[in-house]
Amino acid sequence: MKRILSFVISAFMILALLPCSAAAEQAAGQTAGEQPAEQPTEAVAGDRVVLTIADMNTRSGNRYNGEMGMWRYLAERLGVEIQYDYISPQEYSARLASGDLPDIVATDKNLSTILEYGVALNVDPYLEEYCPNILKGDARLTYDVFKQLGNEGDGFYFFPVKIGYNGVGYDNETTARGYVVRWDYYKELGYPPINNEDDFLSVLLQMHKNHPVTEEGYPTYLYGTDNFSGYDTAFRAELSVDYWAPYKYQNNIFTNEIFDGYTDPAHSMWWASMEWENKLYRAGKADGSYDMDLFTQTIEQFDAKVARGQYLGLHAEKSGLYKNKIKTDPNTLTGYNTVPTSATNFYTNVYQLLGNGPGYMWFISANSQHKEEALSLFNLMYDPDFVRELTLGRRGETWDYDAEGVPRMNEYGQEQLDAYKAGSTDPDNYFVSWGSFDKMPSNWPCLRDNSPHPDGYMVDFATVTREYEKATMSNNISKDICEHYGVELPTDAFYKAGGMDFRNDCGEAIASCMSSLNRDQLNILSKAEAILLDAQVDLILAETDEEWEAIRDEKIRQLVELGEPEVFNVYRKKWNDAAEIIVPLVREVQVRNGVTPYTPEQYADRLGPEDSAQEPEDQNSAGTEVQEP
């Protein structure tokens, strides 16, 4: 029988619980208090231990640079050398199965697999001695939730990362998700409003009519994406679901109600993506404005087209085009940006109780010979003093406390920081050589820069302010947005347009706290994924609504026959059990921090008739009936 397992995390958020079976404990070969099994060899460089780390190469590029001052400082504080490697998903799976792992390893979304292989060290007996920062301050909430959702016998296996607010409601750049357009062409059309998907398609068609080729002669295409997962449609107001939940079970970001994205197309970002891509295909097939290479091109080929401006719309903002153009035209508006509108949701004010869980976490290998050093690394990554230095430079070099105990940048540090934020690439610039929070790999550090520091200020007291964002806004498109919409910051334009953000969403925290599905259930979901993948191209290239609907109905019939709805009913019960605890905690923290959750009256127009009519008590009692598509 599966037990809920928990993970505690640092100053601002909480912990992730996962199922831990008796079989997993036996496979791990250890119980609380036992020493981890030793590896046959030990990595040592000279007088220093070599601490090995494996990250996933699917994480926003290889951002680790051991020559940066921040990483040298970390190694210096630990007294180790760091060997940081990126591995492919295939290698990751193979090494999990074999147990041949480095000291510290990244997670993927399915934490239960790691537990079942028994490759993660139960660090609970060692936290007080080697990683006390995870047990202090706001992180205590995490530990308390662990005690509430887990039980005394459960271990602690995973370290959540980037605990705190993902976005703070103001920024000098806009959200990367929504209706993304080539801004220069969009302005040329007079900034037409985009209130729904059909408006978006109309704008893209007008752009293509005006610009069938780029200035350099490359053909343009209506829309580009590097995946068909629903990363675009999830953020549209008519869906309003959390993209990051495991499987195709996504929650509404306002109510946190969970939906079956396999057999309920009305609440599925994947089915919505298929419908959207089919619209694009039928609109662009005659004149070649639908890019058929989307099915076969590599990510490098896709990025090259983005950098040349060949796509008129994108699934997410990409900076390559703007960066290319600004080199030769300091006033350029050529680049991609999201249109301010109430028709999409703004990914900000997201209080991540469990950080970027469950997909972005770490564990220490059960076979690591260097558990003390690994735990000490996490202790620093949960230390608000250390994370402040990672973010703003070493105390005494770029900043210090004044006579009243207020942290302030010194003249040199402020000068260097301002130049860096303005885009300096001078190797002599302090922050170019030191690094910065936004240059770290996407699952470091464990606290966000907007986390509270014990001194009463944010960890990043220097730049996470509205005033600093205004003063350092240098992007031409951002400035154009402010001028056109009559606002101070681009994010203001979204709220002015009636846009809403993710402040109510608890999806990632809930998913991290759930006990896992069993092997039979996971096997059904694996087959369900294969059924949908098999239909993907046929759905996108369907010539008529009738053909598209026939494919949809047949695939849903296959999914029902497979037994996927029964798996969803089990998952929904687990979800609701975790949500009952997590949602009130997140709301409490949001209110305490001055971010008032949206009321049902405020988000009523973002719920379909089925959503707003459903009574909460019906959520657990639903049978295997599948909603009509």
Kindly label every feature range from the protein language model.
Residues 4, 8-9, 13, 17, ...:
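Extracytoplasmic/secretory soluble proteins
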